[in-house]
Amino acid sequence: MVRYMVTSALPYANGPIHAGHLAGAYLPADIFVRYLRLKGEEVIFISGTDEHGTPITFRALKEGKSPREIVDYYHEHIKTTFERAKISFDYFGRTELPVHYRISQDFFLKALENDHLIKKVSKQAYCEHDKMFLPDRYVIGTCPYCGAENQRGDQCEVCGHPLTPEELINPRCNICGNPITFRDSAHYYIKMQDFAEKLKEWVQSQEHWKPNVKNTVLGWIEEGLEERAITRDLNWGIPVPLDDEDVKGKVLYVWFEAPIGYISITVEHLKREGKENEWKKFWLNLDGGTKVIHFIGKDNIPFHAIFWPAFLMAYGKYKEEETEAEWLLPYDIPANEYLNLEGKKFSTSRNWAIWVHEFLDAFPADYLRYYLTAIMPETRDSDFSFADFKTKINEELVNNLGNFVHRALTFVNRYFDGVVPERGELDDLDRQAFEEIEKALKETGELISTYRFKDALRRVMELAIFGNRYFDYQKPWKTAKENRERTATTVNVSLQIVKVLGVLLEPFLPDASEKIWHLLNLEETKRWEFIEIPAGHRVRRAEILFRKVTDEDIIFFIVNYIARGNPESARLLLDKYYRTDDVVKVALERFGEKRKDEAMAILKSIYGERLEKKAKKEKKKEGGKVEYVKFEDFMKLDLRVGKIVDVQDHPNADKLYVVKVDLGNEVRQLVAGLKKYYSKDDLLNRYVVIIANLEPKKLRGIESQGMLLAADDGENVALLMPDKEVKLGARIR
């Protein structure tokens, strides 16, 4: 039986996680691992924070804190974000642990012992102004390969080519902005040329790798592999484990020790589980039964497919007591491309990004997981668009998937008292339904196994589409009046489809999957197979599975989150889709009266003079001549007293009621946004005032034949009502 060691790239503990990170290395891995677990495979899924190197020291320098304070804070922040996004790591560790120091130093010493390291004196970037050697990331300049400006001295973010500070054109200090000099400094280098041929043969034999990964790696090897430094002039990191004055006070380069974190985190995890020695079967070639799979973004391809395998080769055989084995080289490295935002690359410095922890404050995790999977940059860069996000959630999740599940559960409760009925004789469409169930399981599994997550999700949604079409064709609302056996068969088959959807959705939308399991009242463990719900099984009442995303939701998210990081980014997003007046209205409504000043401050930061001109215009309007309403216009309103005789939840909106109001000579149906302020019992039999001659209007699909009158001070809503009982239909004058 194959076992799997699955990793996601170690995120730097110097900032939060954005949607590009999630779509690149974490969500794909989680989908894959959840599928393996449903299949009953043996799998360990780990990641952890990368807590050394210049990104951490640079952040600490900017914030006036110690590196330890930075990594402790962001380790917890990132870990919590992944938990909220339902990324199901078996263990999320960190590299600032003794076990990681020990194993990393062991790798260094073994490579030195095997003559794969060389000590050299080389020119290192130095800032005369700040009186310090500069790590590569502290140096910026123009990339010599593509001409992109303001690129760091370790890698070009535009073309992806690794760099050294000496290669940069016009290099300067990223702290003070002054030109840099270069001074002699002794460091240890790994002789990458020792592994060139072996790496080339190994990569060429990986026929199952993604073309973008394989081609990138072979291109690098063809260019020639050179010696690369694996120690740095830094005071934060893992000390070089040698009694050598030349490297005293220096540390292991983070790009050397970070991937070793996959091993140290696994060791720490299994030690905590009481299985201290089991790490060997996941990282050593003991029986050929383990597949090591690294999920990464494309910027990490060279480090995982060239340098990391070279480090494993440089170590040689692992020997301990009765164990002697080679390290396992990666079985697969399914790297994803980049995610953009509204047609432009993510930029954390300009806050042109979707920060995951903020997005999850505004929308359910399943919504983010669904959309990122639907647009996953598997073979080319893809684009996050708020308009597309809204469309996909509303049309695909709500109208397709959620609608089908709700229909099936509603009918079994309405016509069979919540009990799964016996099937009668199957017709051709019934038989096709069972074929579709089996095909969906088989084909979705095959797509996930080959990392085609976007297609796999589409295949799941095709089963939901089939379910709706099946339901429409069989017309159970019609057969319920004339053929109960036919209705029972339709409902039974529909519920079988719902159950399989609950299984198929587990890798993609774990919360929705769990809710379907709850609504079906199932206690069995989910497995990647079709096991029927038996007739006679009782299910729960239908509940709304997904709520629609509104323009108001998106406006509030941009104003409340993106604008705080960079008002200019927020303005660009808002101007693309919305009128300024609409944004102001939504912001003031969502922030409420108590936070009005806060809302206005944010809006002013977004719109500047545009908002000030509008405010002056409104102030002049308010402070000048009062705009009177003519008596004749007022008399056009038909205000009448009524009594609420029925209150129901709106099926398509969680803040609205559908109420019936008795006006004496007729009963009107109204839609009212009172759920936050009144319970159903509070409203029932209450006298109210309505506008009776307001033109009917559909609100979320339900017609409202008038309007209830209420006072609203921004915090509370109070219905208007006569102070004593009067005849129903009495007119307000």
Swiss-Prot record:
GN (gene name): metG
EC number(s) from the headed UniProt entry: 6.1.1.10
Entry similarity comment: Belongs to the class-I aminoacyl-tRNA synthetase family. MetG type 1 subfamily.
Organismal lineage: Archaea, Methanobacteriati, Methanobacteriota, Thermococci, Thermococcales
Subunit and interaction comment: Homodimer.
Residues at which Zn(2+) binds: C143, C146, C156, C159
Annotated localization: Cytoplasm
GO biological process entries: methionyl-tRNA aminoacylation
Cofactor note: Binds 1 zinc ion per subunit.
SUPFAM superfamilies, per the entry: Anticodon-binding domain of a subclass of class I aminoacyl-tRNA synthetases, Methionyl-tRNA synthetase (MetRS), Zn-domain, Nucleic acid-binding proteins, Nucleotidylyl transferase
Motif mapping: 'KMSKS' region: 345-349
EC category name: ligase
Identification of the protein by name: Methionine--tRNA ligase
UniProt entry tagged with the keyword Nucleotide-binding: yes
One Gene Ontology cellular component annotation held by this UniProt entry: cytosol
Domain of life assignment: Archaea
